[in-house]
Every structure is written in C-alpha cells, then in structure tokens.
Design a protein with these regions (language model features):
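Positively charged n-region of N-terminal signal peptides that target proteins for export
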Residues: 1-4, 80
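Aromatic (phenylalanine/tyrosine) cluster motif
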Residues: 2, 14-17, 32
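Alpha-helical transmembrane segments of integral membrane proteins
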Residues: 3, 7-11
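Hydrophobic membrane-insertion alpha-helices, especially the h-region
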Residues: 10-22
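Sequence/structural signature of beta-propeller domains
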Residues: 20-338
Length: 338
C-alpha cells in the first residue's frame, strides 16, 4: 500500500501540473485521460470509505480449501476459468507485467503447463472466461485493467482452449481479438463473463459506484476488421455493497477497496461476482433484484472466481501472492441457490 501511495502521489503531482495549464488540448496525452488519472491518484493518497445501505440475502454456503498454486511463476492469479475440455482443470494467468501466457492447473493447484499466446505482451490482463460455441471450447482473456481510468482503449483476445494432455507448450494463435472503449469514458474493470445464451460479453466496472455493467455482442468480436468497438451500457448494479459501518477496524488501509468487484462468472440465469470481501449472486434475468450474499473468508487479494464445470451452485476462487514466497490458495465454495 505504501508503494501504491507513493506512486499515486507522483501521478498526482504530474497530472495536477499538466491540468493546471488550463488547456483542453493537454487534458489527454496520446489518448490517455489525465483527468481520470488525477482523480484516481487523489483517491489513493486520501482514500475515503464509501458506505452503502443495501439489503442482501445471505445464503447458506460452505468453503473448502483445495490446495496451493504450485507453479511459482503464477504469482498473481488475476483471472480464473474452468476448463470445458477436462474435469478438475482450471486456467489462469498473471496480472500486469507478464508476457501473454496462460497457465493450466488442477483444482488442487498442481501445475499442468503453460501456453504462450502469439500476441504482444498485454498491458493489464485482469479477467478470463471459458465458453463453447458449436461444440468448440474457447478461452477469452480480457486486457481491461485500468487503475488510472485513462486508457484510450482496452481489448479482448479469444483462443481455442488447448488440450492439457496433448498441447503442452504449443503457441496459441488468436482466433479473434478486438479493441474497444466505453461510451462514457475509461473504466477500470476486473470482472468479465461470456453469456453464450444471449451471445454477448459482459464487463462489470470496478471503481464506479454504483458499478456499471456493459456488453459487447460476440458477433462483433468475431469480425476480422480493425474497427474500434464501443461497449453498450446495460445497467447500473446497485446490489453490491461497498462496506458496512464498523468494518474500518477490520480491514485497515484496504477498507476502501473491499467491496470492489474483482471477478465474475456466469451460469444459466446467475451472475456470480466476487469482491475482496464476499461474493454475490445476481439474477441475470432481473439485475434490479437484490443480490444474494455468499460469505467468504478474508484471504487477502482475492482476484478471481469461476463456476465449476458441472455445477450451478459451486465455484472456485483464487488469490494472488503478495510476495514470491507466499502461498497462493485455491478454495471451492458450495452454496444453496436462492
């Protein structure tokens, strides 16, 4: 947190100087939104706790520790997806700073291999999902992280899901890849899901309150031209609370971030969203309904969630390592559907 605050202070000074020049033309440099960067830096340097009063049903659940992520090169499991080709296999990748590679691991954390995708190194991979179309299994990886909320565009790439037993080490070629932006300015996002029933990709903003849900039709992603897409806003999500009063003492400096969505998965009529604090189950057919809360243990930087391959009431969650020698866990949570 100290390093983040120091960086934010430097950004604050730089962006404040540029914006103080008062010219609209310098509000952006190479397409990056300095106004949003300044606002983010100010939030980090002087964070404010946001309290929301949201009525949420707590549903019965049981959490099981599955194992440790054994591959030490997977130190920031920022996205998670259940395989559609193999039982008990998960896919993941590192947060920003790594090459364009994905990792396969068992649901107990055993390393099963790495695959490089033939694209330039990503800016900030933050989310992934697995899905099938016409019996072909795919993986979507979303380069949508934007802490400063200033990127001129973000992107997704889709590859055919490799066979863990036979394709180990194979270079994966992108099937589709697309750049896009949001209609109302840059958004930070770590929660993405593919809704094959409706034929769309969903993106849930992280920092906005209320959180905002956007979509892009899959058919537009599958076009081969270089057209920049514009995501369409679906709705505001009011049912994910940031905090309850009295929790500042429990979480300390992490308090302002505890209720921000860091992962999302979809199954049938449910959207499953995790935050650093708890998970929330939303009715995909009526997003105005209150979310159901699934209590999760506080395990540090929980970054990803995915439904298990065969169950609508079970999911895996993973967390990042804070340090290279720290254990990164995988948990399974089973819950009663409302």
């Amino acid at each position: 947190m100290y390093k983040r605050a120091t960086l934010a202070a430097a950004i604050l000074i730089f962006c404040g100087f540029i914006l103080s020049l008062g010219a609209a033309s310098v509000a952006k440099i190479r397409g990056y939104d300095l106004s949003n960067a300044w606002a983010f830096a100010w939030q980090v340097v002087a964070p404010k706790v946001v309290f929301t009063q949201v009525t949420s049903n707590v549903i019965a659940s049981q959490v099981y520790w599955m194992g440790d992520i054994q591959d030490q090169e997977l130190n920031e499991s920022s996205g998670l997806a259940s395989s559609n080709l193999s039982d008990d296999v998960l896919w993941s990748f590192n947060d920003s700073g790594d090459s364009a590679r994905i990792f396969a691991l068992s649901t107990a954390g055993v390393a099963l291999g790495q695959w490089q995708i033939n694209i330039p190194d990503p800016t900030d991979w933050e989310a992934m999902d697995s899905f099938t179309i016409d019996d072909q299994a795919y993986l979507l990886i979303a380069d949508v992280g934007d802490n400063l909320q200033w990127r001129p565009f973000v992107s997704v790439v889709i590859v055919a899901e490799p066979e863990v037993d036979s394709d180990t080490g194979k270079i994966l070629e992108p099937i589709w890849q697309k750049k896009f932006r949001y209609p109302n300015g840059p958004r930070d996002c770590e929660a993405v899901a593919v809704d094959t029933n409706r034929g769309e990709i969903l993106f849930l903003s992280k920092r906005n309150l209320p959180n905002e849900l956007y979509k892009i039709p899959l058919e537009k992603i599958k076009t081969v031209d270089d057209t920049m897409l514009i995501a369409e806003k679906v709705t505001d999500i009011h049912s994910i609370p940031r905090l309850s009063r009295g929790e500042e003492d429990r979480f300390g400096n992490a308090t302002p971030y505890m209720g921000m969505p860091t992962g999302m998965s979809i199954r049938a009529n449910y959207l499953l969203v995790t935050t650093l604090q708890d998970a929330y189950l939303l009715n995909r057919n009526d997003l105005s309904q209150p979310a159901s809360t699934i209590r999760l243990p506080y395990i540090g930087q929980r970054e990803a969630i995915t439904f298990t391959r065969h169950a609508d009431n079970s999911a895996y969650v993973s967390r990042e390592r804070a340090n290279s020698d720290e254990v990164a866990d995988i948990f399974r949570v089973d819950f009663l559907l409302p």
